[in-house]
Regions:
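C-terminal beta-strand-loop-alpha-helix "lid" module of Rossmann-like NAD(P)-dependent dehydrogenases
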Residues: 1-288
Length: 288
């Protein structure tokens, strides 16, 4: 059985850990709110750029669409896997990697696979399973469009060169604080938004011509798609970390209560033993 001194030391150690996890929980909660606000702030731009592409596609015509919008036979597929740089985020990265591995392994053996990873956790998990075409581990957990530009440029250039015929992205969708759902979406060929009736009826003049504007706008649309996914990743990471640290804090509190109970029982037993010894000595002296 542990001594009172050992129990006191362990109580102090667990209490110090609890203070750390509590602080990390509060920091994650603050960052999660900022990440959610960033997701909300990006939506108007995404909505407007989607509407503009609707009008440009209608004005351009299917025969003049840029190559990035035109499907072709799939012989090479690239997977963009978005993960975090840091751990202590519960099962978030494990679920993302598991979804990515499932999607990659389900791809036909006749299709050549390329894997592009964002985040140190994805790099560590996937480097032993596949040959990674590129790894990005220097992107901030509060990303900007400029931060993800090298990623999207790599994919756009590779698709235009014919290095791959399809690009799929694996990332976590922030549903709520307790739920982050891994999703797989196709980046290339770009999935065209459905042309709405008001877009068909809109009379807009594009200069120099709709095809040129569309070709210049599509990379921005891809950037926004990846950027929004990175914002979802940031919100998911902070919410998962907040939940994990809250659970760790609660577990530490329960452990401290158990240790204090054991310490008090041991201390009470020692006091009782000392009282018995004193009483026995007093009785022995009285009998003498």
């Amino acid at each position: 059985m542990a001594s009172p001194l050992e129990l006191r030391r362990r109580i102090r150690s667990v209490d110090n850990t609890r203070q750390i996890t509590r602080a990390m929980q509060l920091v994650a909660a603050s960052r999660m709110r900022r990440a959610q606000e960033a997701v909300q702030a990006a939506r108007p731009y995404a909505t407007h750029i989607s509407g503009m592409i609707e009008r440009l596609v209608l004005a351009t015509g299917n025969d003049r669409l840029p190559p990035i919008l035109q499907p072709r036979p799939i012989e090479r597929t690239a997977f963009l896997v978005l993960t975090t740089n840091r751990g202590l985020a519960g099962p978030l990265n494990t679920n993302i990697v598991r979804t990515a591995v499932s999607e990659i392994d389900a791809t036909s053996d006749a299709i050549e696979i390329s894997v592009v990873v964002v985040g140190k956790k994805g790099h560590l998990a996937l480097r032993g399973l596949y040959t990674l075409s590129a790894v990005f581990t220097d992107i901030s957990d509060q990303p900007s469009v400029l931060d993800i530009a090298p990623v999207t440029q790599l994919l756009v250039d590779g698709y235009e060169r014919g290095d791959f015929d399809e690009v799929r992205m694996v990332y976590p969708e922030f549903v709520n604080i307790l739920t982050q759902q891994p999703r797989v979406v196709r980046l290339f060929p770009v999935v065209l938004p459905e042309v709405q009736q008001d877009a068909r009826e809109a009379d807009i003049i594009f200069e120099p011509d709709p095809a040129s504007v569309l070709e210049a706008l599509i990379p921005r649309f891809v950037e926004m798609t990846v950027y929004r996914a990175m914002l979802e990743l940031a919100a998911s990471e902070q919410s998962a970390r907040m939940v994990a640290m809250r659970a760790a804090t609660e577990n530490a509190t329960e452990l401290i209560e158990g240790l204090r109970l054991a310490y008090n029982k041991l201390r009470q037993a020692r006091i009782t033993s000392e009282i018995i010894d004193i009483a026995s000595g007093a009785n022995a002296l009285a009998d003498a």
